[in-house]
Structures are given as structure tokens and as C-alpha cells.
Amino acid sequence: MGKRRCVPPLEPKLAAGCCGVKKPKLSGSGTHSHGNQSTTVPGSSSGPLQNHQHVDSSSGRENVSDLTLGPGNSPITRMNPASGALSPLPRPNGTANTTKNLVVTAEMCCYCFDVLYCHLYGFPQPRLPRFTNDPYPLFVTWKTGRDKRLRGCIGTFSAMNLHSGLREYTLTSALKDSRFPPLTREELPKLFCSVSLLTNFEDASDYLDWEVGVHGIRIEFINEKGVKRTATYLPEVAKEQDWDQIQTIDSLLRKGGFKAPITSEFRKTIKLTRYRSEKVTISYAEYIASRQHCFQNGTLHAPPLYNHYS
């Protein structure tokens, strides 16, 4: 059994990209080309990015990149990203009536869209949202198209107040994921946004002391050059890739920059921390429909005088 931690066992403000598997090489289990969510968090190389240390999930450097959206748009010409009011939206993780104790909400994704939209169009940033501002480790993920291809995913294992944390990692994941070019205005209608809040950090007894589809994992290991590295996958990654525990660990080692042959003895040297997450995803179409619904029902302030699709 794992030993429960109250807080993540990471350095202050360490961020990590946990989504998007790009052709990982697995030891003795074939190759898997595209993944929906993956991330690596090395523990000692490059410098800080936007006041936080980030980890690039493709290179294993300590410059992070990380976390979704769908096609379609409504014929709306005005909206107010500064408002923060929302209409009913999809429940977190697609559940029905079991989310009353969850912190994560669809409004958080809408706020991320507000922040990104205002940045791309050069408008003032939206006013503070109405959801809780409690501190949580968090990730923001962007995906695109009908097949929901990863477009950016970055987050932090340090607990951040949600208002400032989501604002920061919205832009970091959209514009500074080293695996992708920055998001553009033209891509907005095809985007999906996901917000993941990380909870229940526990020290695992060994590298197999976790469950696929339940736990996210963060591993710490010493590479072939004697340098400490870390890497992480969010809880959904292994299940989406149809990986077992060994495949997941081996993929994560490669994402963390380990280049030597992976043996069963080496896997036993890994220090593993497991965690869970609350996640919600909405599409750009749902975001626009929500904002329009609120405006029509008088719950938004007067919309700004600009064309949303100009």
C-alpha cells in the first residue's frame, strides 16, 4: 500500500507536461505512436519558464509542456469573456449525479477559453472568475479536431490559487509547449480545453503499486549519466493508450530522457508517487453556446463591441 501524502512531493512551483505521447519507444513491447496525454518532469536541467520550472515532455528537460477541445461553432458575433457567468455544461469526467463533491467545474474551462481568446485578439484579460480560488496542483490541456489530437499540455505539481494558476497555465500550455507551435486565432473553433486538478498524492511501495486508469504516476530515477530525472503521466494516459503497467513505466522512462536499455532490475530502482485527478473537458462550441446562453438570459454584462470571428 502507498503512503499517503498531503502535498505533492515536488520542488516548489515545478511544472510538468503530462499529455501527448509522441512516438515513445517501449522496452520489449513495441512502439506506440500517438497518445492523448503524456508528460515528463525532469528534476535537474534547464531553467524556469514564466516564474515556474516547466518540464518538456518530449525532451525530458526541466522546461515543461502539457493539457482539450472540439469542432463546430455557433453564429455568434458578440460575447463577453470578462463576465464569468455560465450556463449548464458537461459534468466533470462525463458523470451524471456523482460530482457534487468535486472541485473542478466546466466554468474553469470556460475561463481558460476567455483567457486564451482575449490574449489572441489583444483584448484586456477577463475579470476574475466566480469559482473557488483554493490552491491545487493543476494542468491545462488543449486538443484539436474530431480526433482530439493533443495541441498543448502544461501544468504544475505545486498548489496554486486557481484563478492565477489557470490563467498562467492556459497561456503556457497554449503558447509555450515545446512540442507544438503556439495556438492561433484560426484554431479556436476546433479546440477542446481540459482542466485537471491533482489530488491524493501517495508514495508507492514499488513501481507497480498503482492502478491503470485510476492513478496518475510520477517517477524519479537516475539516468545513465547519473543525473536525477522525473517524469509524469496523468491518470487517463495509460488507459487511453491501452498500456499495461510495464509499458507505461517504460514509456515514461523514455519521455524522461532515459536512453539505456530498460531492465527489470532498473525498474526496481524507480521511486514512484501516485496521485488522482478531477478532470473536466469542454469544446469551443460548448463554450460559445454557454456564453451566448448567459447573455440571452441576462446573466452576462453587455458584450464588448467586437466581432468574435473577425
UniProtKB/Swiss-Prot annotation:
Region (Disordered): 26-95
PTM sites of type Phosphoserine: S74
Keyword Phosphoprotein carried by entry: yes
Biased composition (Polar residues): 28-66
PROSITE patterns membership: AMMECR1 (PS51112)
Matching SUPFAM superfamilies: AMMECR1-like (SSF143447)
Pfam families xref list: AMMECR1
All residue ranges annotated as the AMMECR1 domain in the record: 97-291
Key words of the record: Phosphoprotein
Gene Ontology cellular component terms for the protein in this record: nucleus
Protein origin, superkingdom: Eukaryota
InterPro entries: AMMECR1, AMMECR1_dom_sf, AMMECR1_domain, AMMECR1_N
The protein's name in its UniProt record: AMMECR1-like protein
Lineage: Eukaryota, Metazoa, Chordata, Craniata, Vertebrata
